[in-house]
């Protein structure tokens, strides 16, 4: 072997050896920063290397920090890992909710504040569709089954939210109430940003929750404080601040 090639091989080997000697807190900082600045290709490559080096705890710690800090980028990071052949990293290093989301499993959307499952009405309200609400009783029937379908655009991941029983998509209506809130419906058509959503993870006690924002209006999906005679609470895109209060405005994602 030529001396130049030997030197090059030794140099490359030294780089890997040096990387393996870097303290975990430095590796965590490097990975966290890659995610926060939306350099997802770099974050994915770092994660693959860490996983191969049996340092999955570094990834887990970064994911937990992203969630604690309410970083939306956590969703894009997880999706790019999933998309780029590292589903095992998502399964092993992220909370189970991320796997449920990106595998398009049937899920329940449970409003943390009231413990109600999101569903669609039997009745159609004009051209708007079926009103969406938190069911006062039903937490188990196919009517509360949903799945999230990911879309990648402009370095962000959005979701269509499909009710699997009705085969209809969750949207916000165009009109607003006196408070500026948009009512939520289930519809057949998905040709509008009103039918696309983005998620922001949050931590409350031991629960991983998600704020669910509408792409068109940037308003969070919430349930009304008014209780219907049936015990239901209507779903709205809320015209107000929600960040910092996941116990009031965020949703749990549970396997159906």
From Swiss-Prot:
It comes from the Eukaryota. Keywords: Lipoprotein, Secreted, Signal. It is found in: Secreted. GO terms for cellular component: extracellular region. Residues 1-17 form the signal peptide. Pfam families: Lipoprotein_11. Its main location: secreted. Detected in larval hemolymph (at protein level). Belongs to the 30 kDa lipoprotein family. This lipoprotein belongs to the group of structurally related '30 kDa proteins' that comprise major protein components of the fifth (and last) instar larvae and of pupae. This is Low molecular mass lipoprotein 3. The lineage of its organism: Eukaryota, Metazoa, Ecdysozoa, Arthropoda, Hexapoda. The gene is LP3.
């Amino acid at each position: 072997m030529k001396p130049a090639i030997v030197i090059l091989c030794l140099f490359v080997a030294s780089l890997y050896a040096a990387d393996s000697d870097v303290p975990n807190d430095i590796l965590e900082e490097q990975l966290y920063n890659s995610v926060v600045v939306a350099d997802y290709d770099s974050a994915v490559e770092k994660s693959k290397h860490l996983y191969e080096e049996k340092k999955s705890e570094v990834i887990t710690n970064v994911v937990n920090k992203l969630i604690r800090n309410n970083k939306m980028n956590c969703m894009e990071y997880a999706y790019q890992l999933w998309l780029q052949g590292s589903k095992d990293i998502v399964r092993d290093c992220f909370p189970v909710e991320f796997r449920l989301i990106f595998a398009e499993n049937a899920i329940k959307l449970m409003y943390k504040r009231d413990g109600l499952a999101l569903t669609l009405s039997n009745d159609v309200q004009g051209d708007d569709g079926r009103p969406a609400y938190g069911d006062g009783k039903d937490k188990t029937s196919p009517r509360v089954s949903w799945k999230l379908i990911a879309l990648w655009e402009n370095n962000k991941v959005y979701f269509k939210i499909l009710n699997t029983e009705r085969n209809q998509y969750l949207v916000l209506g165009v009109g607003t109430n006196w408070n500026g809130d948009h009512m939520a419906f289930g519809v057949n058509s998905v040709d509008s940003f009103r039918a696309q959503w983005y998620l922001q993870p949050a931590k409350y006690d031991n629960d991983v929750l998600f704020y669910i924002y509408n792409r068109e209006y940037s308003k969070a999906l919430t349930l009304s404080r008014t209780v219907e005679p049936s015990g239901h609470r209507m779903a709205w895109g809320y015209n107000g601040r929600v960040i910092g209060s996941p116990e009031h405005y965020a949703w749990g994602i549970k396997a159906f």
